[in-house]
């Protein structure tokens, strides 16, 4: 840290290293206490930041000792007093002694001393820059006053330049020319009036006898690098926090730096402008810079401020570095102020001096650095005329925006009305569609009944046939087909549509007789020519097994019918048992009929029947456990071990009457090639997927309102309410008795409802009237309460009035909610595409799970969320992404399945229980209104209200019933429990699935585009074109990231820097040389931004 010697050949660089010498022998390490003391002393000399000090303090003792030895090997060459004494001797032209004065008189001797002074200044600059902080503080202390000495020498070195400038000024008078030196050296440091006395001792006192010699010596000094090196010394001092504060508080220092612009060396001028620009960016520095140029104007005789600066800028067009520094300084001094008006003023100063015209000439300059600084200034220009036009345009835009907002509000209202109307129409159409489907199903059943009965067995009066009979033959035929598929029976068809059934023997163990009753083997024949047979007897009796009964006729009861039922009226012949009524699915098989059941002679004894319930499925479930019409599923053996889909499967007994009875996942698996699916989703070492717990809806419980009112507070609140109503007590009571809602207002009525007289208050009022006390004793609130309590049926009237006011809004609010529930429920239940989507999901889930958990016959809707959690082996896609691709390739007609589902989001936001409660509340209110009208049938308000709103109430009741039935039906249809499933829970499952499906579609499409782009990119190099153009953006990516980070930081950090640390001035100079200054127009605080055109990295 302590080079004390510099090099004359390298003025701005570090000191020349001394010749290499062998390292001295290492000294032994002292004791720990002494080592720590010497280490702390070395750290203090280094002037390091706290983080570096903390880092070095963590060194071990060996490294600390090496650091101490390195620090102590370096010795400062000269103390600060030596440099100060030499500088004083160069400036002291008055002569400390006659010998010194005589030496100054010799021109040859002075030139020799100038050479020596230049070398001394270089060594001083190196010492100020490299020595430890203690050396610098000693140089600047009150005893040495190194800053004052340095400024005296700087003023002496450039006084001749100022004098020559004034001598060549055509407008100067002779009297002014006779005293240039006094003005140039004493008035340089003029500052504020309070600081003038303080600055007088810093100026050079030249007598008339010595002035000519001093000017001659100053000219010799100014031709050397002394001014440049002096500025370098001041820059080194300002790089320390204490030195910067001393310079900024000095009344003449910045003035002398600004006057150094008159130096002939362009490199010195550029150095001065960089230093002044950095000072301008420090808090309070801008005012000091402007004061320095005011002083410059006075000393140099300018007519306008910055006149000489613009003259140098125009004339020094051969030195690009100076022009860049000059343009940078002008940009910062103009646009770094926060006051916009002051900024315009400074901008016009340079416009008046011809800057804009000169920049137009420099527009085609070849220097990139200069072009960047010029463009930064042009970008910062504050155009008042354009701002005025923008203001006028903004006002017009604001007015237009208000109009557009009004139009948007109007269109939004119209859209909401149109949406409600369309929702009502869709709900009505869904209800009509549902009714039409029911009628179609009824017609199909009648047609099936008539076809199954045949012309010979058809009863003469079809209307007397049992309504539920048509459903039995189809179930019987289904059972026969099922037994045939299982290989338990064989159907033989003979000539003349004769049908016989042969039971195939199965070697099984004898079943136990009581747990699950075994249905008899159902047989059926569509032919009417078959002779009637007795009811089939189930094979659940203990061995030996009973003989199998014959085939029953189509009009006979199925096996589950109870025996000994009376015959139906109007039948041609009485059947042995009546058919089961109703449209419900067939119940489980009943116990075997008694042995006395009538019937034809049975055929010869068949082989023993199969065990009860048929063969078990993969999980050991028999047919009796699967439910009627449910076919047992076999587990699927996959090639690879598949992960388990975490769905909630339904039991076979739970799918009766649901959508899953209509799904055939085995057909889907036969249509798809699952080998690709296995490859992408086979198990790898992966954690178990999250198990979605069953969601439970909790009814919101309203906290009971507490109303514990003290009498005084109640009276005070009543007074406030009456003031809001702004009506007298008698007028209020008359309006209540006449049901005049317009006079009272709904809000006022709701407030009055809180002040209905209590039993205690009524007793007080009764006693007051019985005692016949004067009304004057009562307050205004009490008199109102007295009048208020005299209204007959007051609670009923107040409730009716409140109901009259709330009914239209409440009905208008409830109707769209009911329509949303109806439309959403019916559209979900009637969507064939949604059923096919669920069929595909069921197929894939069984393909993954059946080998371990057995085949599932259905699943909970919440299992759809698990599709997003199941990841492929490479973790790049989910099961939902794969399903989207399969549907797009194999089932393209299903891609828009969500277009069949209406108003799911609106229906999901409806609380059906609350809506139904509100409807019931409206119904009770309407009934109360009707009772009031019966008691007061001459009231036209009640009569008109009942006439206008009774149809609305009837429609609300009908829609609420339809909505409740539709919702419960669709919930049960999908295997959920309507008692525990709310609309918000049910419809949100579909909404989430649709959103996830759409997002997966977009991602799959994006993947396809990226894959196509990669393929196209892979084909391009094969055409002989190297992919070189793509390399520069990749190479510049770190630089662009740095620029983005700089912009992000600088948008958060203000422009005004704080000089609260060492090295701040160097950092500012580095920043402004690297990053062009850009001011945000219209912002109170400017910002530094980084232009992408600069290829340099900015140190932070």
Curated annotation (Swiss-Prot):
Per the record, lipidation of type N-myristoyl glycine is found at: 2
Cytoplasm as a keyword of this entry, yes or no, is yes
Localization (cell) = Cytoplasm; Cell membrane; Cytoplasmic vesicle, Phagosome
What does the record say about its membrane topology? Answer: Lipid-anchor
Q: Compositional bias of type Low complexity: which residue ranges?
A: 1-13, 517-538, 1013-1023
**What are the protein's UniProt keywords?**
Cell membrane, Cell projection, Cytoplasm, Cytoplasmic vesicle, Lipoprotein, Membrane, Myristate, Phosphoprotein
Any single GO molecular-function term of the entry would be: GTPase activating protein binding
What positions does the domain GBD/FH3 occupy?
27-468
* PTM description: Myristoylation mediates membrane localization and blebbing.
| Stretches assigned to the DAD domain | 1059-1090
Query: According to its record, what are the GO cellular component terms?
Result: bleb; cell cortex; cytosol; extracellular exosome; membrane; phagocytic vesicle; plasma membrane
Q: What is this protein called?
A: Formin-like protein 1
The record lists the organism as: Homo sapiens
């Amino acid at each position: 840290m302590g080079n004390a010697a510099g090099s004359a050949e390298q003025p701005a660089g570090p000191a020349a290293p001394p010749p290499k010498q062998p390292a001295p022998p290492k000294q032994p390490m002292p004791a720990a206490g002494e080592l720590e003391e010497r280490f702390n002393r070395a750290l203090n000399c280094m002037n390091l930041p706290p983080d570096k000090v903390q880092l070095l303090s963590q060194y071990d003792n060996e490294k600390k000792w090496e650091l101490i030895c390195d620090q102590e090997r370096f010795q400062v060459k000269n103390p600060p007093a030596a440099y100060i004494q030499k500088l004083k001797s160069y400036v002291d032209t008055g002569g400390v002694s006659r010998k010194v004065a005589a030496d100054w008189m010799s021109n040859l001797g002075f030139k020799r001393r100038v050479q020596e002074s230049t070398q001394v200044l270089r060594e001083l600059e190196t010492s100020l820059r490299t020595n430890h902080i203690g050396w610098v503080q000693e140089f600047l202390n009150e005893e040495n006053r190194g800053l004052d000495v340095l400024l005296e020498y700087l003023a002496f070195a450039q006084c001749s330049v100022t004098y020559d400038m004034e001598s060549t000024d055509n407008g100067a008078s002779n009297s002014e020319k006779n005293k240039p030196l006094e003005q140039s050296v004493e008035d340089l440091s003029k500052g504020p009036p309070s600081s003038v006395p303080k600055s007088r001792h810093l100026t050079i006192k030249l007598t008339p006898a010595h002035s000519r010699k001093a000017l001659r010596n100053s000219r010799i000094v100014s031709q050397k690098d002394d001014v440049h090196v002096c500025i370098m010394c001041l820059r080194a001092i300002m790089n320390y926090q204490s030195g910067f504060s001393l310079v900024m508080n000095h009344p003449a220092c910045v003035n002398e730096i600004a006057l150094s612009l008159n130096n002939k060396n362009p490199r010195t001028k550029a150095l001065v402008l960089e230093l002044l620009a950095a000072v301008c960016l420090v808090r309070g520095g801008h005012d000091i810079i402007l004061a320095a140029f005011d002083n410059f104007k006075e000393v140099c005789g300018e007519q306008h401020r910055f006149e000489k600066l613009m003259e140098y800028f125009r004339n020094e067009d051969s030195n690009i570095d100076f022009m860049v520094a000059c343009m940078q300084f002008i940009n910062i001094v103009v646009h770094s102020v926060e006051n916009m008006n002051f900024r315009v003023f400074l901008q016009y100063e340079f416009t008046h001096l011809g800057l804009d015209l000169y920049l137009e000439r420099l527009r085609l300059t070849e220097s990139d650095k200069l072009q960047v600084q010029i463009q930064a200034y042009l970008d910062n220009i504050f155009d008042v005329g354009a701002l005025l036009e923008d203001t006028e345009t903004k006002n017009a835009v604001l007015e237009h925006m208000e109009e557009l907002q009004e139009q948007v509000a109007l269109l939004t209202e119209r859209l909401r009305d149109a949406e409600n109307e369309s929702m009502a129409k869709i709900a009505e159409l869904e209800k009509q569609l549902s009714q039409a489907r029911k009628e179609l199903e009824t017609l199909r059943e009648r047609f099936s009944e008539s076809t199954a009965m045949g012309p010979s067995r058809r009863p003469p009066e079809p209307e007397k046939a049992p309504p539920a009979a048509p459903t039995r033959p189809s179930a019987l035929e289904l059972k026969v087909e099922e037994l045939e598929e299982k290989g338990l029976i064989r159907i033989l068809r003979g000539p003349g549509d004769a049908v016989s059934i042969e039971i195939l023997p199965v070697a099984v163990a004898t079943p136990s007789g009581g747990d699950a009753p075994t249905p008899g083997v159902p047989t059926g024949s569509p032919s009417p020519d078959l002779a009637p047979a007795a009811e089939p007897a189930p094979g659940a009796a203990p061995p030996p097994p009973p003989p199998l009964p014959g085939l029953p006729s189509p009009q006979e009861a199925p096996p589950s019918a109870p025996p000994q039922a009376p015959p139906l009226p109007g039948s041609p012949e009485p059947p042995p048992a009546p058919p089961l009524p109703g449209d419900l699915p067939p119940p489980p098989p009943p116990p075997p009929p008694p042995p006395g059941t009538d019937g034809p002679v049975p055929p010869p004894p068949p082989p023993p029947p199969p065990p009860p319930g048929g063969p078990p499925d993969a999980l050991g479930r028999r047919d009796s456990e699967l439910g009627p019409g449910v076919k047992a599923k076999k587990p699927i053996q996959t090639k690879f071990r598949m992960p388990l889909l975490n769905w909630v499967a339904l039991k076979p007994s739970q799918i009766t009457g649901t959508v899953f009875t209509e799904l055939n996942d085995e057909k889907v698996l036969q249509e798809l090639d699952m080998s690709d699916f296995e490859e992408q989703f086979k198990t790898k070492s992966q954690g178990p997927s999250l198990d979605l717990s069953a969601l439970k809806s909790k009814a919101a419980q309203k906290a009971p309102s507490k109303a514990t009112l003290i009498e005084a507070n109640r009276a005070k609140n009543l007074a406030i309410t009456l003031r809001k109503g702004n009506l007298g007590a008698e007028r209020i009571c008359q309006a209540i008795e006449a049901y005049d809602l317009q006079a009272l207002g709904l809000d006022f009525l709701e407030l009055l409802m809180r002040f209905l007289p209590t039993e205690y208050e009524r007793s007080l009022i009764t006693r007051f009237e019985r005692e016949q006390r004067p009304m004057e004793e009562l307050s205004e609130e009490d008199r109102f309460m007295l009048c208020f309590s005299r209204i007959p049926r007051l609670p009923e009237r107040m409730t009716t009035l409140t109901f009259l006011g709330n009914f239209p809004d409440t009905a208008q609010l409830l109707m769209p909610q009911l329509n949303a529930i109806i439309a959403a429920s019916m559209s979900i239940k009637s969507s064939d595409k949604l059923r096919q989507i669920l069929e595909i999901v069921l197929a894939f889930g069984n393909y993954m799970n059946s080998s371990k958990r057995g085949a599932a016959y259905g699943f909970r809707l919440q299992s759809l969320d698990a599709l997003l959690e199941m990841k492929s082996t490479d973790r790049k896609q989910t099961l939902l992404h794969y399903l989207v691709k399969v549907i797009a390739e194999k089932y393209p007609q299903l891609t828009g399945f969500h277009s069949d589902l209406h108003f799911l989001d609106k229906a999901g936001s409806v609380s059906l229980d609350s809506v139904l409660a509100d409807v019931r509340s409206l119904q009770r209110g309407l009934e109360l209104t009707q009772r009031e009208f019966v008691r007061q049938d001459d009231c036209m308000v009640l009569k008109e209200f009942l006439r206008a709103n009774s149809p609305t109430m009837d429609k609300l009741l009908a829609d609420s019933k339809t909505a409740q039935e539709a919702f419960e039906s669709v919930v049960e249809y999908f295997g959920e429990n309507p008692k525990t499933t709310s609309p918000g829970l049910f419809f949100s499952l579909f909404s989430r699935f649709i959103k996830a499906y759409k997002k997966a579609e977009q991602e799959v499409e994006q993947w396809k585009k990226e894959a196509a782009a990669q393929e196209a990119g892979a084909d391009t190099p094969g055409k002989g074109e190297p992919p070189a153009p793509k390399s520069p953006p990749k190479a510049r990516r770190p630089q662009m990231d740095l620029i983005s980070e700089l912009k992000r930081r600088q948008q958060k950090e203000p422009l005004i820097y704080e000089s609260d640390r060492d090295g701040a001035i160097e950092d500012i100079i580095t920043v402004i040389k690297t990053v062009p200054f850009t001011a945000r127009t219209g912002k109170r605080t400017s910002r530094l931004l980084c232009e992408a055109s600069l290829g340099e990295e900015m140190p932070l």
